[in-house]
Amino acid sequence: MAAPPRTALVLGGGGLVGGAWMVGVLQAIATETGWDPGSADYVIGTSAGSMVGGMLAAAVPPWLLMAYGSGEALEGLPGLGGSRSNRFGASLQIHWTFPRPVLASPELALRSLREPFKYGPAGIVAWLPQGMISTEPLKTVVRQVVPQGWAAHPNLWVVAIDYDTGERVVFGRQGSPNVDLADAVAASCAIPGFYHPVDLQGRRYIDGGMYSPTNLDLAAGADAELVICLNPMSSRHRGGLLQPSGPIAAFFRGDNRRLVDREVLALRRKGKQVLLLEPQADDLRAMGFNYMSRRTPGRVLACAVRTATASLRGSKLGADLSSLPRGRADRLSRPDTKPSSWPPKLFPPGLQVA
């Protein structure tokens, strides 16, 4: 019998709402196909995908992320006791500071003038003032699971951008700066003009989505034959003029879709199999226009589970994922017993049962 293919799971950006969509899709994959997304040989996360991927790589199963995202009471688990602060919106607690009315990155702004096509969106946002919202709440969420250091997963890559040079940095990959996972995720999520840049070892970092919505091209350097990519920021569906799936939204999603399509084609030319999952029409209606909305994730989670399950059933996509080694039962679906009785093996050290 041939060995199963080595896998890379690529999770793109998309704010709080995109993160909720990815969690719902990952749960559908686990329950419908029997494959544990956290068992991927590589996990590559950008922006919201770095938060979700970091949790998976730290051994948090999708069903627990579902419970966290919906704010469900899980008595007996530190930090997951059911208060409103446990919703996805906890990562957007507002810690304001007022920026100076100057360029956030004068060095990158000047570089973008000399080479206007080299830096993409990062070169444009260099001209904005610095963001006003602290990333500390993001770090707090990660530290609940990984208090310090990196996740135990051998190949968790977190993508950010050096805000002064415009260069892409892949934390967790060999040769990259050695930082805590909480700091790397905060850097990857630091939307310019919204969040503060994250200072690490004398450098400032911003959202890795300023290079690519998924950074799917990094999978070319991964020792993996099968690449599974979830991209909340693209879709093949169009709706009415002012709907989230309509032509106005499609215009903004179009660039993301075309870039990801080019990345997919490049990987396939290298002999890799690529499975791309994107929001369906119902998902787009649930997601709305505001990807940082704290009111939307609950309904997005439920919708994503439903639409992804329907897409997987009887499809080649579902068959390809079902052919992968089956995950442990308690990683695929939630135990029927009370949370306080769940075995410690279910959780990373930061989420042990009290």
Q: What spans do the regions from the language model cover?
A:
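Patatin-like phospholipase
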Residues: M1-T46, M51-A354
